[in-house]
From Swiss-Prot:
GO molecular function: toxin activity
Transmembrane segments: none
Disulphide-bonded residues: 3-21, 14-38, 42-53, 54-59
Organism of provenance: Naja naja (Indian cobra)
Designated name of the protein: Cytotoxin 10
Length: 60
């Protein structure tokens, strides 16, 4: 699986066990991602922070 880094021009190949790509952003500024990368379990979103997870190459 390949996941985009914070700047989507770059990506990395995820290590074994991290089978999801994720994008995290503040609810107040949804167009500005704060973090992107590989993750094993999708975190729960909160009132301030939203997580979007997916499982295809560079989907984040």
């Amino acid at each position: 699986l390949k996941c985009n880094k914070l700047v989507p021009l770059f990506y990395k190949t995820c290590p074994a066990g991290k089978d999801l790509c994720y994008k995290m952003y503040m609810v107040a500024t949804p167009k500005v991602p704060v973090k992107r990368g590989c993750i094993d379990v999708c975190p729960k979103s909160s009132l301030l922070v939203k997580y979007v997870c997916c499982n295809t190459d560079r989907c984040n």
